Amino acid sequence: MGKIMAVNISEKKGTQKKNVHSARLMEEFGIEKDAHAGKWHRQVSLLSYEKIEEFKAKGAPIEDGAFGENLIVSGYDLKALPVGTRLRSGEVLLEVTQIGKKCHSGCEIYKIMGDCIMPREGIFAEVLTGGMIRVGDCVEVVMPQEDRPYSVAVITLSDKAFAGERDDLSGPAIEKILKDSEEKDHIRFDIKETILLPDGEEGLKKQLIRLADQRQVDLILTTGGTGFAPRDMTPEATN
């Protein structure tokens, strides 16, 4: 069983979080008074206490919240937990939604140390059940259920739709097919993200890597970008 070692918040984005020792987590929103709370999949950020201590041993002058993490948890290698894992602490229930993130190379820790552990060690979660959380509270890991729905991301590629010159009809059509399949074939899908991109290769590559590595979705569906125009590069990006 793990333990909460710090509860960190910041009221403004771009500022270091401070350990407030206890806070209220709000369902489907995040930590009360924290700048990163909101209706998105990265409501709460977490780091392993042991990984922070290893980094400190290299001479890093850091305090709780220096990496922008909300919760510091001991007893678990958090990055090894798959997306979909749930973390229970008292009445609070979180679900892991992302592993790692892109680093802002200009952060203060990176400037000093030439390294930052948040991109490879940090994880993110949504609040399924809210409540109070405090330093010293126990944390229990609940592994993902085998019969949970397949997680899906839908990506539409269209220069005109991205520019607002045309409605995206393909993405919603794919969502409808998935919902109809649930009723017909009894296969459950959970659409995690719907993304509209301009045509081209690099933007799609970045999203495919993020969705596969960080979000760990089971299925990525793309539509558009398969014609003969120079910017129709969906097959090339996927390969």
Language-model segments: what does each one mean?
Residues E95-Q98, K102-G106, P144-Y150:
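Short, Lys/Arg- and Gly-enriched loop/turn segments at beta-strand edges
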Residues G122-Q145:
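Well-ordered alpha/beta subsegment
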